[in-house]
Curated annotation (Swiss-Prot):
Pfam families, per database record: ACAS_N, AMP-binding, AMP-binding_C
List of residues binding ATP: 387-389, 411-416, 500, 515, 526
Keywords: Acetylation, ATP-binding, Ligase, Magnesium, Metal-binding, Nucleotide-binding
GO molecular function ontology, one term from the record: ATP binding
GO terms under cellular component: cytosol
Organism this protein belongs to: Brucella melitensis biotype 2 (strain ATCC 23457)
Upper classification of the organism: Bacteria, Pseudomonadati, Pseudomonadota, Alphaproteobacteria, Hyphomicrobiales
Protein name per its UniProtKB record: Acetyl-coenzyme A synthetase
Family: Belongs to the ATP-dependent AMP-binding enzyme family.
Length: 651
């Protein structure tokens, strides 16, 4: 735990939008008079019909969350049309390809035409307001066009990360009954092609077996690679957009009409479709983008996330574009052609604000400082971190080496469910402590609760809950409101439970300590242990599996799998079987879920009632088996001795 304090930099204080006095004043107003505060800030976006109701939320009973519910607007209009008069020729998106010699600049006027054309293609093929459109694209401008085109006509987009497998894609198509998919022939990552169209074809076949029929597939030509073609179903994007008008009227949308579904891992079963709506989400995404990054007009802003994750939704596309910013989209990876790529892009495009994940920073830190110091990075003014808690060592490296001690770091905590940043420093207002997300954003009321539900005051450790709503909050789990209530509002009554543990220090700063449920945070991305376990058990050699996390020097958490084999399967070569299981999990979920350690075991530690004692598995995976705690309920102590003897993570 770092106790170092970095006071607000004089340079950051000079031109800041929010100083400490303003922060304290606004925060007080936001929690004592949320209606008044959010009415004022709700007007930061344009409304076709202004709202008269601001907040209508209840975390008890059936849980209702409504913001600006009688207002009418359109997200695409707010991200594009309203900027055309004053900044039509300003660059909206800088696209930096995987290949360092390929890039593209798209102005707001060009963005308008591209989005309108894609919107008209969707309409031409029968997509209507409320229909779900699945987007399975690499990090190319067409991914942003597709999202904004859906928003323009009132279709609900479900973006699936292009690194997910056909099986994972199919599950998401089936869950939201999507009949229109937008994909590319291939993606390119680190110089290697990714077979997106082939994956899409496989996913559509899987979905059809579950009675969800995809009627149309719009295919962007990215590489020109060979693809199979479904006559009457598959459409080339470049041919389709050439045949439609570059103008499309934005659909008037109620503030509570759905904007998008984004699937995220839970502690049980299949991923859940997080549903975000229109008005409150855009108010919150744009407001957090402006104040957390202290964004000033004319600055170049780069968030390195993928649009397949919520960070890409809120802080590559919707937040920056609603603010008329220039946002950079990066197709590549941090280590191609080498580990200096990020900093070369910063110099090439004169990036002022840079937002990335601790896992990338740890990997780059390990590669050595010379990859950083050979670039100038002189345009950088602000650094950000997202996806998982940043360890103080990586924070210090980021501050000293990347930022040359002249850039504040905003270490932001939030989740897919939150729509935008909840706990964060503000660069001109907050003294920084390496490893701490510091203080809540306006309107956010964090509460620490012990396992019995008692609220902890002052300096404390506990489960992180939020006691009142904010405009960017998810409204439900798509098609399963009961699961929404059970997951987030049943553990601690009347509060949203984040699933994270947290410590509050003597200065009121918050330190996120990691998940307290069965969800792993791998390289800043959430994966449910249940998801990985069911992938393992679907292999014919596996009888039972349990998955836990363990500390990993680069990824934050690694994936440790305990596997019990079917009778007879143990005759196989264990190393070969390990490789086979790794490939099997990658096929079922995607490379992001690649197991780091697989331990074969004759049995798993269970209570007499048959419950797996995960606490013990975690301790063994962490090589901390000396303090297993109370094992009196164990049905068979011998199982634990075997696990300790054969552990895969011996230090």
């Amino acid at each position: 735990m770092s106790e170092k304090l970095y006071p607000v930099l004089p340079e950051a204080k000079k031109n800041t939008l929010i100083d400490n006095e303003t922060y304290l004043e606004w925060y007080e107003e936001s929690v004592s008079d949320p209606d008044g505060f959010w009415a004022k800030h709700g007007r930061r976006i344009d409304w076709f019909k202004p709202f008269t109701k601001v907040k209508n939320t209840d975390f008890n009973g059936d849980v209702t969350i409504k913001w600006y519910e009688d207002g009418v607007t359109n997200v695409s209009y707010n991200c594009i049309d309203r900027h055309l008069k004053s900044r039509g020729d300003k660059v909206a998106i800088i696209w930096e390809g995987d290949n360092p010699y390929i890039d593209k600049k798209i102005t707001y006027r060009e963005l308008y035409e591209n989005v309108c054309r894609m919107a008209n293609v969707l309409k031409k093929h029968g997509v209507k307001k409320g229909d779900r459109v699945t987007i399975y694209l690499p990090m190319i401008p067409e991914a942003a066009y597709a999202m904004l085109a859906c928003a323009r006509i009132g279709a609900v987009h479900s973006v699936v990360f292009a690194g997910f497998s056909p099986e994972a894609l199919a599950g998401r198509i089936v869950d939201c009954e999507s009949t229109f998919v937008i994909t590319a022939d291939e993606g390119v990552r680190g110089g290697k092609p990714v077979a997106l169209k082939e994956n899409t074809d496989t996913a559509i076949d899987i979905a059809a077996k579950q009675y969800v029929m995809v009627n149309k597939v719009l295919v962007v030509r990215r590489t020109g690679g060979k693809v199979s073609w479904g006559r009457g179903r598959d459409l080339w994007y470049h041919q389709e957009v050439a045949s439609v008008e570059p103008h499309c009227e934005p659909e008037p949308m109620n503030a509570e009409d759905p904007l998008f579904i984004l699937y995220t891992s839970g502690s049980t079963g299949k991923p859940k479709g997080v549903l975000h709506t229109t008005g409150g989400y855009l108010v919150y995404a744009s407001m957090t983008h402006q104040y957390v990054f202290d964004y000033h007009d004319g600055e170049i802003y780069w968030c390195t996330a993928d649009v397949g994750w919520v960070t890409g939704h809120s802080y590559i596309v919707y937040g920056p574009l609603a603010n008329g910013a220039t946002t950079l989209m990066f197709e590549g990876v941090p280590n191609f052609p080498d580990q200096g790529r990020f900093w070369e892009v910063v110099d090439k495009h004169h990036v002022n604000i840079f937002y990335t994940a601790p896992t990338a920073l740890r990997a780059l830190m390990g590669a050595g400082d010379e990859f950083v110091t050979r670039s100038s990075r002189s345009t950088l003014r602000l650094l950000g971190s997202v996806g998982e808690p940043i360890n103080p060592e990586a924070w210090e490296w980021y501050y000293n080496v990347v930022g040359d001690q002249k850039c504040p770091i905003v270490d932001t905590w939030w989740q897919t469910e939150n729509g935008g940043i909840l706990i964060t420093p503000l660069p001109g207002a907050t003294d920084l402590k390496p490893g701490s997300a510091t203080r809540p954003f306006f309107g956010v009321k964090p509460v620490l609760v012990d396992n019995e539900g008692n609220v902890q005051e002052c300096v404390a450790d506990g489960n992180l809950c939020i006691s009142d709503s904010w405009p960017g909050q998810m409204r439900t789990v798509y098609g399963d409101h009961k699961r929404f209530i059970e997951t987030y509002f049943s553990t601690y009554k009347g509060m949203y439970f984040s699933g994270d543990g947290c410590r509050r220090d003597e200065d009121g700063y918050y330190w996120i300590t990691g998940r307290v449920d069965d969800v792993l945070n791998i390289s800043g991305h959430r994966l449910g242990t249940a998801e990985i376990e069911s992938a393992l058990v679907s292999h014919h050699s596996v009888s039972e599996a349990a998955v836990v996390g363990y500390p990993h020097p680069i990824k934050g958490q690694g994936i440790y799998c305990y596997v019990t084999l079917m009778t007879g399967a143990d005759a196989q070569d264990p190393d070969e079987l390990r490789k086979e299981l790794v490939q099997h999990v990658r096929k079922e979920i995607g490379p992001i879920a690649t197991p780091d350690k697989i331990q074969f075991a004759p049995g798993l530690p269970k209570t007499r009632s048959g419950k797996i004692m995960r606490r013990i598995l975690r301790k063994i995976a962490e090589d901390e088996f000396g303090a297993l705690g109370d094992t009196s309920t164990l049905a068979d102590r011998g199982v634990v001795d075997d696990l300790i003897e054969n552990r895969q993570n011996k230090k």
